[in-house]
């Protein structure tokens, strides 16, 4: 069996494999905690001194009558930031000593500092667990500065504090768009609660408009999955923090490249256009889309009769929550069975096909259950954020951290935290019974529109509002209550309308905007003159 780790949950584990003597010194100086990402808001980076001379000096001072010099040198090797690549070695960055690091030059795989003239390269064999913001660099020559100008560490939770660290690896076109939107959202929330423009709304509408105009089959595939909360829609469609697998809902070739979306803004009145997408659910045509097996056109019921889909979903709710044994073992298994039926047969209680073939094919292997639990969790976190009397960046940071590190979409079944039977255990084999609050969240999930989710047209929502059920209420809440709860978010977002008067249709203007973005102003002028 191999004796060395290939991925690391801690920097100390990597040190144990490479330099146990240095690890022992760090431990003896009570500095192991300084290498933990949990200690810092923005992760941690360790600079390992390759030069034996520096390590010998650390050892000599550590075991002397005054180990302060060894402590200071070790502190200079610890950066309270997650810096995985040279591209992130920018801005106000310093070591644990508080000394600012001045970068002289960055190359593809190397950073050269001015002060100390240290030459740093990323440790090729250090790969952290996906949810750990840890990095290790090798100092090949020079030294880290012990004195110099201080760097200005941003205040935790302060007004200028970014919602999440900007350093993330890998830095893909998807993550670039997400980080830009997150920064814009944090800025506008602190200014006016995004009452003028909501960045998540703008980008979600733009992406859907692009698909509708340029890739109608992709548009039909994703339309049943859009959410009344544009923040949820944005992350489910873009999947910006997924780093493993190629089962993206929307392929890379459609999103990026010479003819891709590339994050272009394509909207005139964001709120009105967003609501319009929900009215389109019952107005799609499938004359040119046939089932790959039968070659017959079979209109998915999520489009032809969404109300009946939700009626059947309510039957499933009732069966699960009125089951003879509502408990932490039986109930999650019944949830999984319902999702297995949907994934494998595209039916709910043998009624179907629920989704277009392309949609259900994209949701297999636990992805549909993962998506719906994601909706439920993010809805809850977002509601908490919006219910606060004053906006707190830290509340928004919690949402983004959850998406980045707990639910990136790398392993759907392992990222299930509420609905997976494995979280509750089997009392006959493990005796592991989950806390009551987790089970209460499962019941709330079943009692929400997020359970077996399909989008429903806004005009189909009606009825008198009733009191929302509590987390432990086993009686399914009526359908209109679920939907009115999410639709209430649209009342807030109505303030985010941006209307531009024009004599061209929205579709025409959106096509022109995308053309200008990727071909240049002169070309569009030539086109208009023809």
From Swiss-Prot:
Keyword Cell division applies: no
Annotated positions for site DNA-binding: 10, 39
Gene induction: Expressed in the late phase of the viral replicative cycle.
Lineage: superkingdom: Viruses
Gene Ontology cellular-component terms listed: host cell perinuclear region of cytoplasm; virion component
GO BP annotation list: viral capsid assembly
Impact noted for substituting residue 135 to T: In strain: Isolate Uganda
Site (Cleavage) residue list: 158-159, 463-464
UniProt keyword annotation of Disulfide bond present: yes
Effect of residue 131 to N: In strain: Isolate Uganda
Keywords associated with the record: Disulfide bond, Host cytoplasm, Late protein, Ubl conjugation, Virion
Family membership: Belongs to the asfivirus polyprotein pp62 family.
Name of the protein in question: Polyprotein pp62
């Amino acid at each position: 069996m191999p004796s060395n780790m290939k991925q690391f949950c801690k920097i100390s584990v990597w040190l144990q494999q490479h330099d146990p003597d240095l690890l022992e010194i760090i431990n003896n100086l009570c500095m192991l905690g300084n290498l933990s990402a949990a200690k810092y808001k923005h992760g941690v980076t360790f600079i390992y001194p390759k030069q034996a001379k520096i390590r010998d000096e650390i050892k000599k001072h550590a075991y002397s009558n005054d180990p302060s010099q060894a402590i200071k040198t070790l502190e200079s090797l610890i950066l309270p930031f997650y810096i995985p690549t040279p591209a992130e070695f920018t801005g106000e960055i310093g070591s644990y000593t508080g000394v600012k690091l001045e970068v002289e030059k960055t190359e593809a795989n190397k950073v050269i500092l001015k002060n100390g003239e240290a030459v740093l390269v990323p440790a090729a064999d250090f790969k952290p667990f996906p949810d750990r913001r840890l990095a290790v660099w090798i100092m090949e020559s020079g030294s880290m500065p012990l004195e110099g100008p201080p760097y200005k560490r941003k205040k935790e939770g302060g007004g200028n504090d970014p919602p999440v660290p900007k350093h993330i690896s890998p830095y893909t076109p998807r993550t670039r768009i997400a980080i830009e939107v997150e920064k814009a959202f944090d800025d506008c929330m602190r200014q006016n609660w995004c009452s003028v423009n909501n960045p998540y709304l703008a980008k979600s509408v733009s992406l859907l408009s692009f698909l509708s105009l340029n890739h109608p089959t992709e548009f039909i595939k994703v339309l049943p999955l859009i959410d009344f909360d544009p923040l949820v829609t944005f992350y489910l469609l873009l999947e910006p923090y997924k780093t493993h697998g190629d089962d993206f809902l929307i392929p890379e070739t459609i999103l990026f490249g010479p003819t891709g979306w590339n994050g272009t803004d394509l909207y005139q009145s964001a709120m009105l256009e967003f609501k319009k997408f929900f009215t389109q659910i019952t107005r799609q045509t499938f004359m040119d889309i046939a089932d790959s097996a039968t070659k017959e056109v079979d209109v998915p019921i999520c489009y032809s009769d969404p109300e009946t889909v939700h009626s059947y979903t309510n039957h499933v709710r009732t069966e699960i929550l009125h089951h003879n044994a509502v408990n932490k073992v039986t109930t999650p298994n019944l949830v999984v069975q319902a999702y297995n039926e949907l994934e494998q047969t595209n039916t709910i209680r043998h009624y179907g096909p629920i989704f277009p073939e392309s949609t259900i094919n994209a949701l297999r292997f636990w992805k549909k259950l993962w998506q719906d639990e994601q909706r439920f969790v993010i809805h809850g976190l977002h509601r908490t954020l919006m219910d606060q009397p004053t906006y707190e960046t830290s509340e928004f940071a919690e949402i983004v951290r959850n998406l980045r590190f707990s639910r990136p979409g790398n392993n759907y079944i392992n990222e299930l935290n509420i609905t997976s039977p494995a979280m509750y255990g089997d009392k006959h084999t493990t005796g592991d019974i989950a806390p009551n609050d987790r089970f209460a969240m499962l019941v709330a999930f079943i009692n929400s529109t997020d359970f077996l989710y399909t989008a429903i047209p806004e005009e189909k929502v009606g009825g008198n509002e009733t009191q929302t059920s509590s987390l432990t209420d086993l009686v399914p809440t009526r359908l209109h209550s679920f939907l009115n709860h999410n639709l209430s978010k649209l009342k807030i977002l109505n303030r985010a309308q941006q209307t531009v008067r024009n004599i061209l249709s929205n579709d025409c203007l959106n096509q022109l905007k995308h053309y200008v973005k990727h071909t240049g102003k002169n070309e569009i002028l030539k086109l208009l003159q023809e």
